[in-house]
Amino acid sequence: MTSSSPILKQTPKFLSALEGQSHANPPVWFMRQAGRYLPEYRAVRATAPDFISFCFDPEKAAEVTLQPMRRFPFDASIVFADILLIPGALGQKVWFEAGEGPKLGDMPSVESMAEKAGEAGKALSLVGETLTRVRSALDPDKALIGFAGAPWTVATYMIEKGSSDRSGARTFAYQNPETLDALIQVLVDATIDYLAMQVDAGAQALKLFESWAEGLSEPLFDRLVTQPHIRIIEGLRARGVTVPIIGFPRGAGTLVEDYAARTPVQGVALDTSASAKLGQTIQKTKTIQGALDPLLLRAGGDALLKRVDEMLEQWNQGPYIFNLGHGILPDTPIAHVEAVLERVTGQKVGQ
């Protein structure tokens, strides 16, 4: 297996930040930067019959991945896909309903899913085709990020069949610990294979999205978040994958510091609640990423630019990647994105 994508003449700023370097103007990208706030995205999305088909169309997915790179001076591009592709690869039906979000069918037995976990990369090879298309079109100084939903977060959707109420999954964790641990391990194995495929296809960095880390007790957080992340990273390294990895335990609060200390990630993405001190503490050993509130980005005005300045002042003395604390909202004005990017890059952006 290829341990990393082809060597480029210039190390992208995003990757150098993950190596621990600081920059006068930090690298910047936004979660969900390819999305509905862009009219060009909406135009392409309208040509796909449904969201899953959209994710599995390499031509369309590559196009929307590249759209924000053409419009804005982002330093990294993240492949357009979804965290719920892995359940489909394991045999659970996944679909999206307009205005309601993801829906999942009955979860197959853990035993049947375990048989498919080692073939997740093959089952999701169309995402690899998207990555290859994007990498060939990206400027050499721009980095390409692959990603996956982390096991606990994916498991919550699989257990609750798409419900946004995590209480059912937490209750399942208490009542069925052995079954949940087995499911988490299946997802660890599938995620390793899926992410290794993404690196082979051109991803230069990886991100684990633990979107539902909030509300877990310290013992549950260790069992369902920290330990599975460690196993994924160790599994990738054992397969020769050397690219940097960012972990995003969203909503974990003070447990993020322990997560950063114990997991072998190179970067830790912070959510909007992260304090200046928390970020500075983690920066002593890791690169941090984040953590502008998407609601503030949408609101705009003086408060937005003031917060951008605060974040740069408190975190840009160490290795730092400017980003949001969650995905960009669909009704975010493009002018607000441009204003933030002007402030971060020090360059004129937009018209």
From Swiss-Prot:
GO terms for biological process: protoporphyrinogen IX biosynthetic process from glutamate. The record marks D82 as: Transition state stabilizer. It catalyses: uroporphyrinogen III + 4 H(+) = coproporphyrinogen III + 4 CO2. Pfam families: URO-D. SUPFAM superfamilies: UROD/MetE-like. The keyword Secreted does not apply. GO terms for cellular component: cytosol. It is an enzyme of class 4 (lyase). Its main location: cytoplasm. Keywords: Cytoplasm, Decarboxylase, Lyase, Porphyrin biosynthesis. One of its GO terms (molecular function) is uroporphyrinogen decarboxylase activity. InterPro entries: UROD/MetE-like_sf, Uroporphyrinogen_deCO2ase_HemE, Uroporphyrinogen_deCOase. Belongs to the uroporphyrinogen decarboxylase family. Catalyzes the decarboxylation of four acetate groups of uroporphyrinogen III to yield coproporphyrinogen III. Homodimer. This is Uroporphyrinogen decarboxylase. It comes from Caulobacter vibrioides (strain NA1000 / CB15N) (Caulobacter crescentus).
